[in-house]
Design a protein with these regions (language model features):
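Loop-to-helix entry region of an early transmembrane alpha helix in multi-pass inner-membrane enzymes
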Residues: 64, 76-99, 103, 120, ...
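Juxtamembrane segments of multi-pass membrane glycosylation machinery
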Residues: 55-61, 69-92, 97, 111-115, ...
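Transmembrane-helix motifs of polytopic, lipid-linked glycan transferases
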Residues: 88-116, 156-160, 329-334
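N-terminal membrane topogenic signal
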Residues: 9-23
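Short helix- or helix-capping micro-motifs
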Residues: 123-131, 184, 188
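Extracytoplasmic catalytic/substrate-binding loops of multi-pass membrane glycan-assembly enzymes
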Residues: 36-48, 58-70, 264-265, 461-465
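Membrane-interface interhelical loops and short amphipathic "cap" helices
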Residues: 41-51, 75-84, 134-143, 366-384, ...
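ER/secretory pathway lumenal C-terminal domains and tails of membrane proteins involved
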Residues: 2-4, 107-112, 141-151, 163-180, ...
Length: 749
């Protein structure tokens, strides 16, 4: 019996079970709170936590609606700290999404099931499966970015569209469409995924009530609603002109303070549109495929396999593959059941699934995934990290079809144990007896598998290691020092530590990948140096006076900064003479295309050394790899904790300073003091149960390397007992993160 037939009989109760959906969403929220991160995490988490707390601008296009929403949650007294409050926002969004999938699954099941408890059971299956899919769960317990807010927007729009499909001629139909348009525009102000549901809405309207598009007033109202929803973007040029510490893209033409003239200027418009269109990323056209489309589908399949059993260590590959096929086939069966039983809502939900799977895969046009096809190694272009979060919407929405498919199989098996004829409206249908449903219910254990299979990998409970790493790296730098970093994971956590928790704001953090932009270098000149709190500083730097600098560490005007070229050619070594009279020999670097020279970022690093060194301490994060060595500073670097300090004259060996073949000059005294009295991460890393995210494994590895090298240095100066203590801590870190192989490799060097 189709939904149309059922709907024609007035005895069928189609009222949504909002109470049951609310209970399901609440239970999902409880699960997420139980596994919630107490702090920040790797990648973009710290950037967005800090941007929300400071009402700043994260990377383009700036996600203004999320920033406003995140700021609101950051001041709500619902958790002990800012990070947890914004993480709760992510958990709440995903829990509400689960409630929406519950309602949609229940609505489809209402087309052929007479008893409400049966429909509620189907809705519960959708909520459970969707909320425990690995990527959904992992994104819901720590606010890595904006994806859970986008998810709840898409889920709400989906439910509203299903309601519209039920009564497209009703008195609320037009208002529903305008509300859908507004929420889509508001969703776009959070992330471009806000428009993901619109193609499916369009298809549903074309099929069910095509004359809607002939009503120009309604169409115009819908377009205006979308534009109105996007108005949070208007806040960007205004907020940017107040120059918050996180001001990526700097969407203002103002230089020193906000004013009407510079706010409403061509320069502001150009910078705003450059930011809005994400021009700086230079992504190739969709028609210019980075890899074959089949390989991109393979990337999605890799991440789809993760959803039902996140086998980070590859120890359950066969079980993961079997589960993936089961959940894929159940979803396809559910789609077929949806088509057969409720054609109207299918005309929305079917195109939605197509949009968030095949169409999204084609549009995103990714390279090979970081973890995809490892046998190909570096012979193929790869993303710098796994992009499973971009398919969060597909894995979450897929749960509705999986629930429908699983329920259909459950019903078929239950009918084998006996059924009864039941009146449903004007029709009579065969429905399994209650005892038959119970007899077949063990099948539903399939829906519980992701809950238990993903708990360890998805849970962030008690994880503070990212925050602790940021604390430790900042504390490795002397007061008022400049710390040079290279990318997301050694930069964004520092922003969080400084802007949210107030840890070592005196340190000037310079990210080389951002130094290639004009707005970042203007902020380097503009931002004042903040004071050092001696009482909160590490013991390694106690007993000395540290005068606060009165000017930026670089002697350039805004105009001079903007005029620095993207790169300069340099065929041979060249001397760099500092303002204090010291001379360094700078080496050209091999850049893309075999070009030898220096990038804009390299030039700014040299300008800082030229203008501020040695009165301003200069450090390179040890996550920078060989970057400072490539520049020619290798003999002038001393390892100090998690950083390498630039010195004016190569040191000499002593009881606290040794030269190690694998590390270079090593400051035993300062590093030992930091390791034993200041660092927080060794304890939190030792508590881990593995390190799931392989692309960021360099962060725990820097502790393994530091501990191993420190122990080696201590042995070299006759401090064997201290070396054993350090090595014991290092071994606990390696065991907790599952990186004992890296420790063994380090010890063999």
């Amino acid at each position: 019996m189709t939904a149309t037939t059922a709907a024609s009989s007035g005895d069928v109760d189609y009222r949504p079970s909002y109470g049951a959906a609310a209970i399901a969403a609440t239970l999902v929220l409880v699960l997420y709170i139980a596994t919630l991160a107490p702090s920040t995490a790797m990648w973009d988490t710290s950037e967005y936590l800090a941007a929300a707390f400071t009402l700043g601008l994260p990377h383009p296009p700036g996600n203004p609606f999320f920033v406003l929403l995140g700021r609101f949650f950051s001041i709500l007294p619902i958790a002990p700290n800012v990070a947890m409050r914004i993480n709760i926002l992510a958990a709440l969004c995903s829990a509400v999404s689960a409630g929406m999938w519950f309602l949609i699954a229940e609505r489809v099941l209402a087309g052929w099931l007479p008893r409400r408890w049966q429909r509620i059971a189907g809705g519960a299956l959708a909520a459970l499966i969707g909320s425990t899919a690995f990527t959904v769960w992992a994104q819901s317990v720590v606010n890595e970015k904006v994806y859970t807010v986008s998810l709840v927007g898409m889920a709400i729009v989906s439910w509203l569209t299903v309601r519209w499909c039920d009564d497209p001629e009703g008195p609320k139909a037009d208002r529903l469409l305008i509300l859908i348009a507004y929420l889509s525009g508001l969703g776009y102000a959070n992330h471009m995924a806000g428009f993901l549901a619109l193609p499916a809405v369009f298809v549903a309207v074309v099929v069910i009530r095509p004359r809607t598009f002939l009503r120009w007033k309604l169409v115009l109202a819908g377009l205006l609603a979308i534009v109105l929803g996007m108005t949070p973007f208007l806040a960007q040029p205004i907020r940017s002109a107040y120059f918050p510490r996180i001001n990526e893209g700097e969407t203002t033409g103002c230089v020193t303070k906000i004013a009407v003239g510079c706010t409403f200027s061509d320069l502001t418009y150009q910078r705003f549109m450059y930011n809005f269109n994400r021009t700086q990323y230079g992504k190739p056209a969709v028609t210019d495929r980075q890899i074959p489309f089949t390989a991109q589908i393979g990337m999605w399949w890799t991440y789809f396999r993760w959803q039902w059993l996140r086998d980070a260590n590859g120890t359950h590959a066969a079980a993961q593959e079997v589960l993936a096929w089961i959940f894929l086939l159940l979803g396809l069966l559910g789609g077929w059941v949806h088509w057969q039983r409720d054609r109207r809502s299918f005309w929305f939900f079917g195109p939605l699934i197509f949009t968030v799977t095949l169409l999204l895969i084609y549009y995103m046009n990714f390279k090979y995934g970081y973890s995809q096809s490892p046998e190909l190694g570096d012979a193929v272009p790869r993303e710098v990290r796994d992009r499973d979060y971009f398919y969060l919407w597909s894995f979450s929405a897929w749960s509705v079809w999986v629930a429908l498919g699983l329920f259909n199989v459950w019903e078929r098996i239950a009918q084998m144990f006996g059924s009864d004829s039941v009146r449903m409206g004007a029709d009579t249908v065969e429905v399994p007896r209650q005892s038959s449903w119970m007899a077949a219910s063990p099948l539903l254990l399939l829906a519980v598998i992701p809950l238990f299979a993903n708990w360890t990998a998805a849970s962030r409970h008690g994880q503070t290691d990212t925050r602790d790493f940021a604390h430790d790296l900042l504390e490795s730098v002397e007061p008022y020092g400049v710390l040079i970093t290279v990318g997301d994971n050694d930069t964004f956590p520092l922003w969080y530590a400084q802007e949210v928790e107030g840890i070592r704001p005196d340190v000037t953090v310079l990210c080389t990948s951002l130094l290639n932009t004009d707005w970042y270098t203007r902020q380097l000149i503009r931002n004042p140096i903040r004071p050092y709190d001696l009482a909160d500083g590490p013991l390694a730097y106690a007993g000395s006076t540290w005068p606060q600098p009165t000017k930026a560490p670089i002697n350039l005007t805004y105009t001079q900064s903007d005029s620095v070229p993207p790169a300069v050619a340099l065929d041979a070594n060249q001397d760099l003479k500092t303002a204090s009279g010291y001379t360094f020999t700078v080496h050209p670097r091999e850049l893309d295309g075999g070009f030898h020279g220096l990038e804009r970022a390299d030039l700014f690093v040299l300008y800082i050394i030229r203008d501020a060194f040695p009165s301003t301490p200069v450090y390179f994060s040890r996550t920078d790899g060989s970057y400072p060595d490539e520049m020619g500073f290798g003999n002038y670097l001393v390892t100090t904790g998690l950083a390498r300090k630039l010195v004016a004259v190569p040191p000499t060996a002593s009881a606290t300073m040794v030269h190690l073949p694998s590390e270079g000059w090593f400051d035993i005294g300062t590093t030992y003091s930091l390791w034993t009295k200041t660092f927080d991460a060794p304890k939190s890393l030792a508590r881990r149960d593995g390190w799931v995210d392989r692309p960021s494994v360099g962060i725990p590895y820097v502790y393994i390397r530091t501990g191993a090298v420190l122990a080696e240095a201590l042995v070299q100066v006759g401090r064997a007992a201290d070396a054993q203590k350090v090595m014991a801590t290092t071994e606990r870190v390696a065991k907790g993160t599952g990186l004992t192989d890296l420790l063994a490799a380090q010890q063999q060097q």
